Curated annotation (Swiss-Prot):
Main location: cytoplasm
Cellular component annotations (GO), alphabetically ordered: cytoplasm
Binding site residues for ATP: R262, S263, E264, E349, I350, S351, S352
Alphabetic keyword roster: Aminoacyl-tRNA synthetase, ATP-binding, Cytoplasm, Ligase, Nucleotide-binding, Protein biosynthesis
Superkingdom, taxonomy of origin: Bacteria
Family listed: Belongs to the class-II aminoacyl-tRNA synthetase family. Type-1 seryl-tRNA synthetase subfamily.
Gene Ontology MF terms in the entry: ATP binding; serine-tRNA ligase activity
Pathway the protein takes part in: Aminoacyl-tRNA biosynthesis; selenocysteinyl-tRNA(Sec) biosynthesis; L-seryl-tRNA(Sec) from L-serine and tRNA(Sec): step 1/1
Enzyme Commission number: 6.1.1.11
Protein name: Serine--tRNA ligase
Catalytic activity: tRNA(Ser) + L-serine + ATP = L-seryl-tRNA(Ser) + AMP + diphosphate + H(+); tRNA(Sec) + L-serine + ATP = L-seryl-tRNA(Sec) + AMP + diphosphate + H(+)
Length: 430
């Protein structure tokens, strides 16, 4: 949600930032509604003052025996009451109209975010690791002989339809180990607090992080009204919803491993083979709630935490700064980490690390009390994948594949696999 005071003060800058998002100017319409709302409130306050003054005079007129003045004042009190009710309704209607516009507009890009329309305009920051030189043509994950039998799309389609997978045996074990490895790293080495939260949430929870109302079609809703979370960013960020916390307690750093559910409404025909884009998947998510002065540094810290997972797994990757047109709805700055997938001969997104400024905090009324005793202020919220488990599994399998159909697993993962080091061409851990 946007700060109406900031729009009043710098409408041209607001419109310029929207233009970077590919949107038309909106400040004139917003300020016209805001002015009408404020005028109705002012008029209602004036009418209330007039009514109060007239009410005080009614008794005096009655006591003096001035019947005509008494009736005039009584009629005035009644008229003002009706006027106040009308103006209150007008103010409420304008407030609802204003909220409807503001809640549909995305966050504004940070000044250091590059201009651009889509992923072609993103700016690479750095690359880490060197893609392996194979002496055979590397396969995509679902075609690797040691993997194919344990990654069952046919059975999943029978159970649930397209964009689902059933993992079996060694592959299921590696998938589980990856999630545990990520979560343990973030909690034991990176200082995040592990959270196990619901995957079913209320409208208000989805609204607070910006999923509703704009992206309702991208999510799943149960028949009794709960929403299945598209990411545990929703629940982790909402832990501080409606709270006023002491400044000294910040930052709050959370991590969770959860199921995630997405309809992929806008992805028809994209990534239909394999498990790169699924309706149900698992992710280890990081969320930080910070003092505004610390949010930029915190984003760099979170980025390092996510990159550190790939460093440990020895998976080559690159990090890009997203342009304004490619950022998510709630972000003011986003870095994508893209893992090298030799089967596709390209880098693919495996994590997004975003700072949202006060955008989400304003929607969910999450604030902190300054240590100097000042008025409560909105916190800043940040989120990042640490990492997407299924996509990380793909990267591990494709980068570790061998000519005989087996897969060599990263050394960092061995302790979570009981010392096993590879998946054989027959699909067994060894």
């Amino acid at each position: 949600m946007h700060d109406i005071r900031a729009i009043r003060e710098t409408p041209a800058a607001f419109d310029a930032a929207l233009a970077l998002r590919g949107l038309s100017a909106a400040s004139a319409d917003i300020l016209a509604i805001d002015e009408a709302r404020r005028a109705a409130i002012t008029q209602a306050e004036t009418a209330q003052a007039d009514r109060n003054a007239a009410s005080k005079e009614v008794g005096k007129a009655k006591a003096s025996g001035d019947e005509a003045e008494f009736e005039r004042l009584r009629a005035l009190v009644s008229t003002k009451k009706d006027e106040i009710a009308r103006l209150d309704e007008e103010a409420k209607a304008k407030d609802a109209e204003l909220t409807a516009i503001l809640e549909a507009l995305p966050n504004l890009p940070s000044p250091d975010v590059p201009a651009g329309a889509d992923e072609d305009d993103n700016v690479e920051q750095h690359r880490r690791g060197t893609p392996r030189a194979f002496d055979f043509k590397p396969l995509e994950h679902f075609d690797i002989p040691g993997i194919a039998a344990s990654m069952d799309f046919e059975t999943a389609a029978k159970l649930s339809g397209a964009r689902f997978v059933t993992l079996k045996g060694a592959v299921a074990r590696v998938h589980r180990a990856l999630a545990q490895f990520m979560l343990d790293t973030h909690t034991e080495e990176n200082g995040l607090t592990e959270i196990n939260a619901p995957v079913l949430v209320r409208d208000e929870t989805m609204y607070g992080t910006g999923q509703l109302p704009k992206f309702a079609e991208d999510s799943y809703q149960t028949t009794n009204g709960w929403w299945l979370i598209p990411t545990s960013e929703v629940t982790l960020t909402s832990l501080d919803s409606g709270n006023i916390v002491d400044e000294a307690t910040l930052p709050h750093r959370y991590a969770a491993h959860s199921l995630c559910f997405r309809s992929e409404a806008g992805s028809a025909g994209r990534d239909t083979a394999g498990m790169l884009r699924q309706h149900q998947f698992e992710k280890v998510e990081m969320v930080s709630v910070t003092h505004p002065d610390q949010s930029n540094a915190e984003q760099q810290r979170m980025l390092a935490c996510a990159e550190g997972i790939l460093d440990k797994l020895e998976i080559p990757y690159r990090t890009v700064l997203l342009c304004a047109g490619d950022m998510g709805f709630g972000a003011t700055r986003t870095y994508d980490i893209e893992a090298w997938l030799p089967g596709q001969d390209t880098y693919r997104e495996i994590s997004s690390v975003s700072t949202c400024g006060a955008f989400q905090a304003r929607r969910m009324n999450a604030r902190f009390k300054p240590s100097d005793g000042g008025k409560p202020e909105f916190v800043h919220t940040l989120n990042g994948s640490g990492l997407a488990v299924g996509r990380c599994l793909i990267a591990v399998l494709e980068n570790g594949q061998n000519a005989d159909g087996s897969v060599t697993l990263p050394a960092a993962l061995h302790p979570w696999l009981g010392g096993k080091t590879r998946i054989t061409a027959e699909g067994n851990l060894a």
